[in-house]
């Protein structure tokens, strides 16, 4: 449990006095002494209480500190600091500040008045106001003269603040002093810079002035809560290091490839050629000289003065498309862009976009690749490169977009999401612990005060009874109830006690039928700090009733006076008649039918608002305004009557009612101010009524909840984002503002500031916001052009990386986390929703009753018995069973016992006892809260008996169920419905049941044909029942069996797949050139007939084989049937000559669906499609919700901009007339009549009605074409008036708001919903992957089990001396590292290449490259010599070998290869793959390896999705070819990018897959009449006339493609990457990963050179020391190795598995993980070594150590024994020498080693020296010379040697005379 706070109550606050300081000193001494005495048994070191950290709010449990204690030093509340010199100060807002109790600056003690005064000032809010006002001044682009004075004032205030901080805290010595807080470094720096810039002249002042901007960061230090978010951001940036490195590496490799492929290509332009003297500069197509190759030389040599370079560099001689700033690019390869007649393709001039877009050097190539990765304006680069290099290079972009853009960018998202998730879980865990403590505290209080204070349960009628729910209540729903935190009047969070709703007459909760007080778990997720942490409990001492009351006071949101006021004025209970009237009103207003009526009114009102358009007739306008009045009246009446029925006190306790009241009030205000100019904005508030639908629409409700909760939780993050945006906007303005003004002519032809500039704060803010949207490159070019490349790159990249990649991904991570788990359980406060369903239920019940009555009457009239229908009823009921709408599963938990549940279930009105509504049946399709059980499912299996009976009652003919018949699910696509579920279904899945998604694949194949027709058919037409055992029936049966055999044969299926592919391929040839290729056309027509015949035959065969029943119950067969029908109809029409009919033509375009038949045949695609179909209900739901959400913005757009986008243009120059010439439409018409050169036109994408508004919003949300819409809006004035430049500037804000809410939230919601849905499907399948086929799953598992390797037998060292030396050389790690360094150097030499390098540099680089090739060839040769045939057993070696051969071939044959293939330099790029090997050598690269591992694991699923995406692109491109092949070439459609041929279509669609440039391709298709296009234009080579588009088809085509590809399929890609990243993270998040085991094996191989799997025990210490972390056991390691208790085999050898397990155990400890690891390692080992040497351990290291110890003990004992004997003998010798020996005394030691040694020592020969050695003395010999007798096993014999030292120790020195010994 989390740390328990000290006892609550105000008694805790004590002044900090000298006595307190003395007490701290005393405690400090005591702890010091205790530490010196020695550590006690191990216990966790104490940690500071997180609730009492400096900067946090004081936990509510302490109550309100008395006023006299605020802002004064108090003793520290946190027990952790009791022995440290600190004190705390609590501010008025109850924020805790902690100070150091040492004298500040060695002068001011904590009790000095100066310091106390400083503390009081320090915590004042003045500083915040100063910072904000300073920020306002910084936003001024032209500050007034007096601003300098203000600047001094600010500097003064900041200096004063810093001084106060230093006085109150101390400067830097000791904790909690000024410089110990990193945030104060910021202050220190800002102040220092202010003084430095003031007194020292430092040149570039504007750059230094930008330092002042950092003051805005000071807001972070002042606002509580911001610091934590910033910490989280820094945390996620740390986590991103690996991704960043990988990204930079990948981009570098791609940039090198780009450099080699496209260097210099983007400078190829169309130059007017040949030069003709009489040719004017402005006649691009009028070339007078024949365009032949000799022209070049003729002109050059005939005109000596002609300057070729100047001519081609001159822009007048280059070909420009109208309206384009850059010359048209071209290329010289066959599929590159062509030049118009009279022009030649040459390399001239600078690169496009001011020269910044190119692949001419590594830096620019890297920038281009970064742009591709972030997908900003990448379609332009794509088109430019393809135009210059050729269409085949599309492949390069495909790889970069899929690997670079989709993978790396989403990896960043995955990392940020993971960092957020980890923090989130930590805070949730903490919250849970606090919750438990709080419950425990309440339990204690309750037990103490039970008798007097609290009743056990609230009585039903009491008005304010409170029930304290204890933690051990049986209710599973407990957590829901306890987790909500309420906000009090001051906006602080406090925990909530469960208020039981009073009964029917008095309850607010029940008035809104079930607006319960239980909180959603959702709030738990994000109320991180305050509410949850304040639930901390205390070690309850004896607490009085006062404490309980105080605690309850703390729980109540507002001061008591408010409650008195509310009870007096907001509860209207006066006289009896009023009460009766009120009850009557309540009865009517609360009736479900009224709710239904109100909902219908909301829908109608929304429709009325959406019907507004331009131009509108007066009658229509009048009708709309009357409608508005009526609806306003209805809603006002509803509010008024509800107020009467419920009393304001209860009415305003329900969120929806507050919402209603606000909208009604605004609507009434708007009616009053209808004619006031400029207040039309109020009309927009009516739109919020749409949100009332959320009451009855769970998904919308959920979306609003998610946005609400995210915005709540994002409060701080949003602030941080706002600060970042502000800082960068000011930085941009200060750094570049002046440059924009001074150098404006470089970027604008009129020398006026463009729309995007940084000259003032608002525009600077817009640029920063645009970068956050992901559009940075265009503004950066302009910035680089006016202010230089360096600073612009730095600033823009910082905004991009910090703002876009980190902060916005944190937003997204937060959104995704809102989906996790069941925190969005629909059905907590959906009482209103239930009313709606009750109403619908009543209606349907009425309808059913009427229907039954009619049927019964008819049957009676027909004379049938009445019994029959009644008998059939249950069957029908049964058939409905699988699709019944279930009770919301949450409600099954609400009542504790099953019986109550049954009763509730049966109540016809649907209202449960206690006023809690139970029927929670979601409305929208696919919304059920729990999944639908199939008929075979026994739902009740695991439930309690009582509950199961209840369930059965529900399953039976329950009247409720009849009532909800209307709402039943529509089965989706027959067999594929298994995946239906709500967007965020909260169903808790049981372990996988028999029914799974892949049901149809799993079923065993029938061996015989099934019945042809259903039983019902046979019943109605008896003739269909044929006897198959005889006659014709038998022949028919045999025919069916034959057909069945054919159809089931593998070859048949293969043949059909082949035909499908051929017929699909045939469609690709039907392009605009088909009429010119007669042969191809004839072949295709013939093939079409053949295909149709084959497919019809296949269909008939399947009908006969499977029967109609089986065929038509399979969704895939229906698809086949539909597509074959289309082919048949179009073929018949062709034969009858009707092919030119409109309907037949459109039917022919449907042939594009043919490839869909491939779906069911390719398992990979089918798997993905099944998963998608499962997600369709959710995706549709979110789509609908998005549409509703966008509807508001669309209607608002129509209100603001309808008819205002029209403008008058000059038809020759295509430019706008200024207002001075043309002010409005009539002026324009006058000019048109006079000159024919004016035209009153509208912007193609506009807001003239809601439909067009939606298209505009889609363009804004995808950030494509949005700038044009924005410009039109910002320039708009009034209807039929000519627009003026930025006259309506603040309309930008509409777009900013829509982008944040409409684009950001709703589009990212798609990702959330898709990921959530796939996770649900996975859970259904028992956590199997839903995007992979069985084969691919095997690959995936193999990837995961990469590490099941045993130590390999190392490559044997060659016996040859020279080979052996080479072998030793190349085996060293040094050699590997050396080669890696060379590869990196090689990469660097490739990087320094540029397009315009000098011949010397080129020559030098060529030589360097040759040198590298020589070195790498040498490496290869050395390895070949040393490794011999083993060289080819390693994949890397083969790779190196191939690269070397390619490099040599490339250098030798470079000219030949370049002529026919790609540039040979590309082979060198391949070598970069070897850098991958570095990753193995760098220990720190584990994170990067994880990321690559995640990619490897994602590959199979990504391949399937890629296939599906290609299929979709194929179908759409065929469709595009048949519809848009002839549209006018303008905007995004030109000679290369169009729908004329299949290749061009695919290129266009690939570009749109990322939503790139789709607005430009759509524009020409929106042309439908002259003068925009020409419907009578002849298209050469075909009979199709005109070049107009079809706007409706075009919009449908693009919107559907964008939704399918960009929003769904691409997001599936994201879902998979996130999923696999988590898996890879788990794998690598383990303490050990495969790499560690690999490292273990490699080290083992060095010690066990023979590959025996054993090493000597003596080697173990060195081996364990040689291992790398985390497995390493560093020396000295003897004891630890002995503790490991390793088994030893004969010869003191140890087996590798035992060592591996032991070192693994050291890392993991005794955990479950370790047990699993042990099993898996042993299993892998046994699997890999079936014939392994059986090793029987004879002892273990511990046993061996014990034996050694025992031997030592014996040795010591024997030594002591000898010692004593030695002393005896020495004394005897001494006595003998001095002659004091008794005659009868014998020598103690007559013989043996002791006697002999001592005799020698004392200079006298011992007697009997030659005697046999004593049996006590073991023979002295060293191991090898000892005889053959080995010691017995398990017995260690240690020879005891008697050394001279020992004897010397026991004998006295000769020169000392001893005194006489006393006897």
UniProtKB/Swiss-Prot annotation:
Q: Which organism is it from?
A: Tetraodon nigroviridis (Spotted green pufferfish)
Which residue ranges are assigned to the Cytoplasmic compartment in the record's topology? 1-125, 169-182, 224-242, 415-592, 643-656, 697-712, 812-1051, 1102-1115, 1162-1178, 1312-1374, 1423-1434, 1483-1501, 1618-1863
The protein here is known as Sodium channel protein type 4 subunit alpha A
Where do Polar residues bias regions lie?
A: 452-472
Q: How does it sit in the membrane?
A: Multi-pass membrane protein
Q: What does the subunit section of this Swiss-Prot or TrEMBL entry state?
A: Voltage-gated sodium (Nav) channels consist of an ion-conducting alpha subunit which is functional on its own associated with regulatory beta subunits.
Q: Could you tell me which Gene3D superfamilies the record lists for this protein?
A: 1.10.287.70, EF-hand, iswi atpase, Voltage-gated potassium channels. Chain C
One cellular component (GO) term of this entry = voltage-gated sodium channel complex
Extract the CDD domains matched here.
Na_channel_gate
Residues on Extracellular side: 141-147, 201-206, 263-361, 387-393, 612-622, 677-678, 732-760, 782-792, 1070-1082, 1135-1142, 1199-1250, 1273-1289, 1393-1403, 1453-1465, 1520-1541, 1565-1594
What this protein catalyses is:
Na(+)(in) = Na(+)(out)
Q: Which GO terms describe its molecular function?
A: calcium ion binding; voltage-gated sodium channel activity
Segments of skewed composition (Acidic residues):
936-951, 995-1005
SS bond partners? 270-330, 339-345, 745-751, 783-792, 1208-1228, 1573-1588
PANTHER family in UniProt = SODIUM CHANNEL PROTEIN TYPE 4 SUBUNIT ALPHA (PTHR10037:SF223), VOLTAGE-GATED CATION CHANNEL CALCIUM AND SODIUM (PTHR10037)
Point out the glycosylated residues in this chain: 204, 278, 291, 332, 1210, 1224
Q: Where in the cell is it found?
A: Cell membrane
Question: What's this protein's function?
Answer: Pore-forming subunit of a voltage-gated sodium (Nav) channel that directly mediates the depolarizing phase of action potentials in excitable membranes. Navs, also called VGSCs (voltage-gated sodium channels) or VDSCs (voltage-dependent sodium channels), operate by switching between closed and open conformations depending on the voltage difference across the membrane. In the open conformation they allow Na(+) ions to selectively pass through the pore, along their electrochemical gradient.
Similarity section: Belongs to the sodium channel (TC 1.A.1.10) family. Nav1.4/SCN4A subfamily.
Q: What is known of its domains?
A: The sequence contains 4 internal repeats, each with 5 hydrophobic segments (S1, S2, S3, S5, S6) and one positively charged segment (S4). Segments S4 are probably the voltage-sensors and are characterized by a series of positively charged amino acids at every third position.
Cite the record's Basic and acidic residues compositional bias ranges.
28-40, 1780-1794, 1804-1814
> Which parts dip into the membrane without crossing it?
362-386, 761-781, 1251-1272, 1542-1564
């Amino acid at each position: 449990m989390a740390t328990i706070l000290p006892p609550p109550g105000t008694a805790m606050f004590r002044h900090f006095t000298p006595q307190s300081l003395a007490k701290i000193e005393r405690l400090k001494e005591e702890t010091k002494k205790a530490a010196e005495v020695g550590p006690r048994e191990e216990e966790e070191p104490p940690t500071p209480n997180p609730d009492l950290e400096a900067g946090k709010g004081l936990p509510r449990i302490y109550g309100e500190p008395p006023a006299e204690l605020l802002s004064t030093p108090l003793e520290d509340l946190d027990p952790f600091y009791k022995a440290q010199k600190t004190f705390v100060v609590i501010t008025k807002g109850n924020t805790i500040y902690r100070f150091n109790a040492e004298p500040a600056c060695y002068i001011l003690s904590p009790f000095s008045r100066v310091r106390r005064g400083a503390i009081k000032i320090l915590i004042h809010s003045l500083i915040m106001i100063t910072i904000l006002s300073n920020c306002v001044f910084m936003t001024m682009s032209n500050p007034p003269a007096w601003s300098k004075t203000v600047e001094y004032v600010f500097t003064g205030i900041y200096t004063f603040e810093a001084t106060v901080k230093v006085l109150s805290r101390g400067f830097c010595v000791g904790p909690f002093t000024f410089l110990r807080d990193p945030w104060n470094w910021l202050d220190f720096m800002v102040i220092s810079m202010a003084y430095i810039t003031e007194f020292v002249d430092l040149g570039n002042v504007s750059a230094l002035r930008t330092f002042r901007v950092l003051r805005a960061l000071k807001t972070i230090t002042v606002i509580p809560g911001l610091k934590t978010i910033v910490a989280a951001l820094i945390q996620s940036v740390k986590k991103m290091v690996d991704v960043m490195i990988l990204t930079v590496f990948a981009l570098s490799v791609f940039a090198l490839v780009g450099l080699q492929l496209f260097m210099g290509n983007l400078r190829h332009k169309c130059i007017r050629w040949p030069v003709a003297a009489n040719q004017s500069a402005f006649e691009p197509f009028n070339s007078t000289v024949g365009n032949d190759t000799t022209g070049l030389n003729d002109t050059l040599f005939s005109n000596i003065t002609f300057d070729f370079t100047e001519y081609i560099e001159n822009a007048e001689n280059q070909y420009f498309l109208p309206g384009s700033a850059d010359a048209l690019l071209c290329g010289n390869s066959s599929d590159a862009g062509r030049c118009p007649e009279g022009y030649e393709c040459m390399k001239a001039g600078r690169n496009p976009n001011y020269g910044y877009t190119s692949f001419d050097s590594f830096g620019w190539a890297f920038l281009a690749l970064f742009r591709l990765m972030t997908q900003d304006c990448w379609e332009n680069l794509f088109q430019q490169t393809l135009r210059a290099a050729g269409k085949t290079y599309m492949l390069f972009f495909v790889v970069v977009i899929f690997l670079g853009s989709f993978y790396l960018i989403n990896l960043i998202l995955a990392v940020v999401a993971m960092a957020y998730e980890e923090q989130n879980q930590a805070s949730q865990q903490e919250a849970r612990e606090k919750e438990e403590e709080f419950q425990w505290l309440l339990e204690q209080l309750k037990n103490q005060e039970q008798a007097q204070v609290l009743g056990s349960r609230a009585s039903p009628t009491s008005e304010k009874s409170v029930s304290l729910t204890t933690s051990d209540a049986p209710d599973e729903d407990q957590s829901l109830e306890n987790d909500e935190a309420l906000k009090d009047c001051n906006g602080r969070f406090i925990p909530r006690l469960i208020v039981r709703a009073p009964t029917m007459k008095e309850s607010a909760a029940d008035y809104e039928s079930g607006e319960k007080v239980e909180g959603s778990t959702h709030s738990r997720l994000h109320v991180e700090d305050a509410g949850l942490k304040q639930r901390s409990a205390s070690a309850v001492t004896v607490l009085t009733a006062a404490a309980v009351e105080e605690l309850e006071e703390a729980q109540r949101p507002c001061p008591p006076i408010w409650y008195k006021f509310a009870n007096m004025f907001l509860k209207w209970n006066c006289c009896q008649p009023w009460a009766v009237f009120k009850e009557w009103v309540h009865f009517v207003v609360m009736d479900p039918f009224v709710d239904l009526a109100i909902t219908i009114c909301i829908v109608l009102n929304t429709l009325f608002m959406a019907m507004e358009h331009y131009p509108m007739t007066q009658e229509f306008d009048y009708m709309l305004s009357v409608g508005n009045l009526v609806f306003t009246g209805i809603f006002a009446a509803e509010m008024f009557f509800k107020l009467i029925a419920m009393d304001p006190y209860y009415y305003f306790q329900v969120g929806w009612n507050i919402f209603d009241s606000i909208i009604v009030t605004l609507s009434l205000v708007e009616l009053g101010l209808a004619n006031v100019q400029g207040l039309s904005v109020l009309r927009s508030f009516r739109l919020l009524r749409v949100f009332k639908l959320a009451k009855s629409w769970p998904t919308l409700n959920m979306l609003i909840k998610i946005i609400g909760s995210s915005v709540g939780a994002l409060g701080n993050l949003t602030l941080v984002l706002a600060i970042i945006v502000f800082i960068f906007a000011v930085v941009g303005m200060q750094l570049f503002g002046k440059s924009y003004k001074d150098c404006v002519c470089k970027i604008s032809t009129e020398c006026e500031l463009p729309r995007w500039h940084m000259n003032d704060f608002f525009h600077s803010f817009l640029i920063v916001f645009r970068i956050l949207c992901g559009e940075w490159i265009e503004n950066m070019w302009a910035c680089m052009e006016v202010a230089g490349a360096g600073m612009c790159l730095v600033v823009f990249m910082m905004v991009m990386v910090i703002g876009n990649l980190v902060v916005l991904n944190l937003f997204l991570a937060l959104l995704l986390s809102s989906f996790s788990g069941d925190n969005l359980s629909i059905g907590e406060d959906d009482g209103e929703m239930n009313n709606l369903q009750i109403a619908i239920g009543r209606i349907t019940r009425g309808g059913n009753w009427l229907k039954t009555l009619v049927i019964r009457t008819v049957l009676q009239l027909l004379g049938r018995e009445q019994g029959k229908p009644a008998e059939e009823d249950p069957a029908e009921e049964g058939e409905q069973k699988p699709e019944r709408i279930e009770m919301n599963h949450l409600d099954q938990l609400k009542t504790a016992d099953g019986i109550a549940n049954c009763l509730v279930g049966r109540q016809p009105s649907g209202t449960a006892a206690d006023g809690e509504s139970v029927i929670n049946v979601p409305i929208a399709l696919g919304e059920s809260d729990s999944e639908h059980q199939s008929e075979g499912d026994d739902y009740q299996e695991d439930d309690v008996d009582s509950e199961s009976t209840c369930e059965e009652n529900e399953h039976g003919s329950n009247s409720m169920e009849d009532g909800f018949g209307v709402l039943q699910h529509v089965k989706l696509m027959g067999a594929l419905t298994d995946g239906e579920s709500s967007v965020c279904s909260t169903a808790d899945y049981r372990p996988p049941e028999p029914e799974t998604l892949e049901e149809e694949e799993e079923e065993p194949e029938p061996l015989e044909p099934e019945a042809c027709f259903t039983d019902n058919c046979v019943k109605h037409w008896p003739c269909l029942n044929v006897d198959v055992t005889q006659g014709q029936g038998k022949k028919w049966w045999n025919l069916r069996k034959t057909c069945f055999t054919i159809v089931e044969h593998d070859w048949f299926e293969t043949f059909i797949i082949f035909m499908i592919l051929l017929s699909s391929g045939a469609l690709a040839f039907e392009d605009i050139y088909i009429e010119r290729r007669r042969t191809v056309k004839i072949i295709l027509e013939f093939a079409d007939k053949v295909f149709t015949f084959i497919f019809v035959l296949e269909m008939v065969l399947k009908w006969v084989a499977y029967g109609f029943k089986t065929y038509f119950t399979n969704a895939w067969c229906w698809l086949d049937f539909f597509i074959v029908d289309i082919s048949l109809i179009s073929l018949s029409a062709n034969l009858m000559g009707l092919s030119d009919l409109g309907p037949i033509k459109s039917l022919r375009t449907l042939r594009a669906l043919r490839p869909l038949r491939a779906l069911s045949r390719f398992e990979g695609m089918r798997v993905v499609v099944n998963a998608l179909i499962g997600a369709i209900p959710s995706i549709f739901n979110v789509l609908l919700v998005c549409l509703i959400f966008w509807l508001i913005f669309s209607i608002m757009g129509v209100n603001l901009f309808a008819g205002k986008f029209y403008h008058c243009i000059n038809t020759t120059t295509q430019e706008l007339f200024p207002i001075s010439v043309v002010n409005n439409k009539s002026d324009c018409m006058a000019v048109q009549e006079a000159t024919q050169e004016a035209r009153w036109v509208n912007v193609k994408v506009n807001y003239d009605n809601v439909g067009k508004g939606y298209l505009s919003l889609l363009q804004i949300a995808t950030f494509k074409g949005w700038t044009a819409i924005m410009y039109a809006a910002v320039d708009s004035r009034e209807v039929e008036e000519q627009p003026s430049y930025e006259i309506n500037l603040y309309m930008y804000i509409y777009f900013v708001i829509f982008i944040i809410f409409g684009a950001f939230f709703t589009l990212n919601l798609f990702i959330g919903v898709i990921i959530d849905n796939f996770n649900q499907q996975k859970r259904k399948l028992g956590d199997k992957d839903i995007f992979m086929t069985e084969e691919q799953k095997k690959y995936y598992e193999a990837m995961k089990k990469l590490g099941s390797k045993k130590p390999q037998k190392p490559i044997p060292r060659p016996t040859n001396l020279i080979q052996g030396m080479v072998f030793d050389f190349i085996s060293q790690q040094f050699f590997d590292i050396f080669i890696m360094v060379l590869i990196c150097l090689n990469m660097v030499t490739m990087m320094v290449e540029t397009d315009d390098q000098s011949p010397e540099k080129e020559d030098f680089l060529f030589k360097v490259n040759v040198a590298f090739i020589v070195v790498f060839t040498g490496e290869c040769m050395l390895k070949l010599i040393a490794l011999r045939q083993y060289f080819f057993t390693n994949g890397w070696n083969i790779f190196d070998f191939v690269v070397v051969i390619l490099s040599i071939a490339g250098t030798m044959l470079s000219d030949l290869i370049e002529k026919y293939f790609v540039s040979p330099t590309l082979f060198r790029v391949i070598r970069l793959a070897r850098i991958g090997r570095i990753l193995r050598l760098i220990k720190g690269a584990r994170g990067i390896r994880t990321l690559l591992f995640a990619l490897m694991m994602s590959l199979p699923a990504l391949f399937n999705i890629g296939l599906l995406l290609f299929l979709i692109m194929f179908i759409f491109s065929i469709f595009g070819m048949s519809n848009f092949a002839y549209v006018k070439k303008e905007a995004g459609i030109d000679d290369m990018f169009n729908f004329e041929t299949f290749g061009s279509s695919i290129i266009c669609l690939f570009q749109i897959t990322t939503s790139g440039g789709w607005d430009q391709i759509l524009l020409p298709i929106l042309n439908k009449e002259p003068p925009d296009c020409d419907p009578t234009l002849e298209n050469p080579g075909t009979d199709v006339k005109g070049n107009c588009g079809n706007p409706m088809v075009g919009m449908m085509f693009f919107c559907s493609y964008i939704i399918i590809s960009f929003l769904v399929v691409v997001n599936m890609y994201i879902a998979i990457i996130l999923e696999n990243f988590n898996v890879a993270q788990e794998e690598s998040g383990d303490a050990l990963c495969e790499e560690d085991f690999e490292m273990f094996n490699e080290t083992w191989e060095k010690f066990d050179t023979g590959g025996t799997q054993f090493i000597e025990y003596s080697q173990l210490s060195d081996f364990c020391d040689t291992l790398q972390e985390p497995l390493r056991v560093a020396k000295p390691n003897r004891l630890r190795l002995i503790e490991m208790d390793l088994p030893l085999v004969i010869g003191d050898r140890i087996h590798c598995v035992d060592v591996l397990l032991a070192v693994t155990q050291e890392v993991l400890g005794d955990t479950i993980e370790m047990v699993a690891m042990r099993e898996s390692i042993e299993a892998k080992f046994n699997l890999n070594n079936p014939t392994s040497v059986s090793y029987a351990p004879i002892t273990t290291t511990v046993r061996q150590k014990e034996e050694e110890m025992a031997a030592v003990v014996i040795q010591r004992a024997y030594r002591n024994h000898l010692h004593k004997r030695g002393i005896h003998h020495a004394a005897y010798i001494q006595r003998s020498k001095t002659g004091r020996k008794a005659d009868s005394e014998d020598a103690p030691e007559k013989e043996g080693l002791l006697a002999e040694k001592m005799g020698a020592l004392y200079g006298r020969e011992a007697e009997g020296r030659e005697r046999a050695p004593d049996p006590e003395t073991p023979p002295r010999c060293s191991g090898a010379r000892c005889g053959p007798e080995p010691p017995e096993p398990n017995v260690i014999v240690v020879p005891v040697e008697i050394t001279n030292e020992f004897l010397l120790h026991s004998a006295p020195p000769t020169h000392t005379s001893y005194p006489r010994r006393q006897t």
